[in-house]
């Protein structure tokens, strides 16, 4: 971030600060944070990056890690949840700004940056979220007053700042929600801002041992790059072999993750009842060679969607560390032997389960981000040779 990037911030002007005042304070404080905190994922230094990006609805930083691994530098982040902010700070050395719907928060966004990244809240559009809201008589999709309109704040930021590109993520059901009308509105809104729009549903199971289909949307500024520009999803490098869940399972796991007799009996009875009715609801056990079901934010409640069998014992939940690895985050000693480059979990188990259940498959976002980075460098006439990765293990 530089002084020129914050000249437009009205909140700073209201406080009597100049852009240079803010820039000097920001740089000094940020360097102190990096030096004192010794965070595992600080990202490239200013001036050494290939592109800049902002991280909206940042969660625990799945987009940030992925884009930093492609030599991008984050110049703004926003996340409303205080527990996710804590995890974000522990790993990246920055506390994200809060509610992105507030003008004061938006005023801190640099005037210029290259890519807008955002995995905007999926509950209004997910199958599980919609089903629950319907059963409770609540609105869903764009009619959800709390979360359904958050996309339009993204559109507003794109319209005001005109980044070179956007990179968005949401649930698979976004494409079919409300008979396709929701997706149509998103597409037409972004195209109406003179951006290209390409989207694809991709399963994270090619990168991690988890079935997790998500909708990815990428677009370029057509005013800058012309009408023919578009994102090349076919250039994404997909691993030759899918990983299995045995690669992320720990041994000698704390007994607290083993299901109680009462909970295990309840899950078995619940599954039996629904099986007799012809429904598919129930718990999901895994084998070392298998791929798990989709990890959800409700995993902390009973762990039923992903249970690990144990000889002579009730099955157990995944540990938070295993959940981190299941989403592709490097965490010692499961998928990295570098203690200094291991994801930090500074919150309770329940909060960690929610955070990883809400997160993205980081290596998949990294793979898409690599193509996006290369296209931007090519469009801007810069060298597209890949630099050494800062890197997370895939």
For each predicted feature, which ranges?
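C-terminal target-recognition/interaction regions appended to catalytic cores
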Residues: 1-28, 33, 39-40, 262-394
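Core alpha/beta nucleotide-donor-binding catalytic domains of modification enzymes
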Residues: 18-162, 172-176, 181
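Conserved small-residue
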Residues: 59, 88, 116-119, 154, ...
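Short clusters of hydrophobic/aromatic residues that line enzyme substrate/ligand-binding pockets
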Residues: 100, 125, 174, 208, ...
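Class I S-adenosyl-L-methionine
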Residues: 106-113, 127-294, 298-300
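Active-site/binding-pocket entry motifs
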Residues: 122, 126, 223, 301, ...
């Amino acid at each position: 971030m530089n002084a020129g990037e914050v000249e437009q911030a009205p909140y700073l002007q209201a406080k009597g600060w100049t852009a240079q005042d803010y820039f000097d304070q920001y740089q000094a404080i940020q360097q102190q944070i990096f030096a004192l905190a010794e965070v595992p994922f600080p990202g490239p230094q200013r001036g050494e990056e290939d592109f800049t990006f902002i991280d909206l609805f940042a969660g625990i930083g799945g987009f940030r890690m992925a884009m930093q691994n492609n030599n991008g530098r984050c110049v703004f982040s926003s996340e409303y949840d205080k527990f996710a902010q804590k995890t974000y700070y522990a790993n990246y050395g920055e506390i994200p700004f809060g509610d992105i719907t507030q003008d004061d928060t938006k005023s801190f966004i640099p005037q210029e940056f290259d890519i807008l990244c955002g995995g905007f809240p999926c509950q209004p559009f997910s199958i599980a979220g919609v089903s629950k809201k319907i059963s409770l008589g609540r609105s869903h999709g764009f009619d959800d007053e709390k979360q359904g309109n958050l996309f339009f704040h993204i559109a507003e930021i794109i319209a005001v700042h005109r980044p070179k590109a956007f990179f968005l993520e949401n649930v698979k059901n976004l494409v079919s929600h409300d008979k396709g009308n929701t997706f149509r509105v998103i597409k037409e809104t972004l195209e109406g801002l003179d951006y290209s729009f390409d989207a694809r549903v991709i399963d994270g199971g090619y990168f991690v041992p988890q079935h997790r289909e998500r909708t990815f949307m990428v677009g370029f500024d057509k005013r800058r790059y012309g009408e023919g520009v578009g994102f090349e999803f076919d250039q994404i490098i997909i691993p030759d072999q899918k990983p299995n869940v045995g690669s992320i399972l720990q041994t000698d796991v704390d007994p607290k993750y083993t299901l109680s007799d009462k909970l295990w009996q309840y899950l078995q009875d619940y599954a039996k009842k629904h099986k007799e009715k012809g429904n598919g609801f129930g718990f999901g056990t895994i084998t070392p060679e298998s791929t798990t079901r989709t990890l959800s934010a409700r995993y902390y409640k009973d762990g039923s969607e992903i249970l690990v069998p144990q000889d002579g014992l009730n099955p157990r939940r995944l540990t938070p560390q295993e959940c981190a690895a299941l989403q592709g985050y490097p965490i010692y000693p499961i998928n990295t032997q570098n203690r200094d480059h291991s994801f930090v979990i500074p919150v309770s188990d329940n909060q960690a389960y929610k955070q990883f259940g809400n997160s993205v498959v980081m290596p998949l976002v990294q793979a898409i981000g690599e193509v996006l980075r290369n296209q931007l460098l090519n469009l801007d006439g810069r060298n597209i040779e890949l630099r050494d990765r800062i890197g997370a293990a895939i």
